[in-house]
Amino acid sequence: MLSGFVCDERLLNYKTGAGAHVFSMTNDLIEPYFHIDNSLSKKRLYNLIKKLKLLKDLRIVKVRTADINEILLIHEYEYIKIIKSLSEANGGDAGYGTPFSRNAFEIASLGIGGLIELSEKVFLGEIKNGFALIRPPGHHALENTGYGFCIFNNVAIAAECLKKKYNLSRIAIIDWDVHHGNGTEKIFYHRNDVLYISIHQQNCYPKNSGSSNDYGLKDGKGYNININVPAGSGHASYIYAFKEIVVGALESYKPQIIFVCCGFDSSGIDPLSRTLCHADTFRFMTKTILKLADQLCEGKVVMSQEGGYSETHVPFCGLAVLEEMIDNERRFLDPVKETIVHQGGETLLENQKKMINESFEALNILKSNHKY
């Protein structure tokens, strides 16, 4: 059985307009160029997949326009209406640093629709697993506002669609984007039918978001696990976090399907983080998730593209993920790894271990909720 793959030229042409890094053009001393959230890194990932002839090992899942009722499962009507109106004009800002150009609503709806289609095919066993190379990203978006380049919360919408249609009671979302998925956390914070686990650089973005003490409220207590890593963490920290926290959480929860908010911005050369991951880090995390999924939910894993801003490194990080998903016999080496490893991150330091261990409290609450 083949892995599924969603991508479309229209998604890769999603535009955020001119900018200067993450900054809007409000200072006339900053010379404008591309906004940091442009499509180039994702286009280069797609180009690498084509160059290596991996598309033949993937089942292409076509995008479709998400129905407004699907988006309404998560987002408020007035907010959707504003985005649609601005998109039909000349674009605007969805909120908290989320600029977009004309036709953004149409493009975002295509990405959401494609992810929903992919998720359903994975759940029904029509494809082995799935990767959605979609834009714009989603995990920061809240119910009534955009946030951090994200207009709509793609994974939250897809997960909620599956839950409603197939009466699911245990959906896991693993978020390894280097920035905390504040939107996804808030949406599911009071619920136990979705387990949200985020591993992120401490206090990178958003500010003061993603504390290990934020482990959910009411029915959701123990179903929100934030794993913080300090700046300078790398491969060793992520291995430790996965082995000690993520594996135990998934084994206790026994999800019916696993979504991954698949950001590549923990790369050692990403401009929006200070972590030291490389392609083998993403390979390890993918392999771990796939192995657990085989044991817990018949291999049902859906990866959805989030951040990643290094035009050089994102393609190789994404390639490592796809190679594991399709079980490709060849493993292409990461040409950037040596440069990253030279800076550190391969040894777990005591301060890194101590910070990760703060997440055991949330894990233990989850385990106490699932003593079968």
Q: Across the structure, where does each feature detected by a protein language model lie?
A:
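N-terminal low-complexity, Ser/Thr- and acidic-residue-enriched intrinsically disordered segments
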Residues: 1-70
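A general "terminal functional-core" signal
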Residues: 1-6, 11-12, 20, 81-372
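Short coil/turn segments at secondary-structure boundaries
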Residues: 33-36, 58, 62, 74, ...
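Charged, often glycine-rich, active-site loop that binds/positions anionic groups
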Residues: 63-88
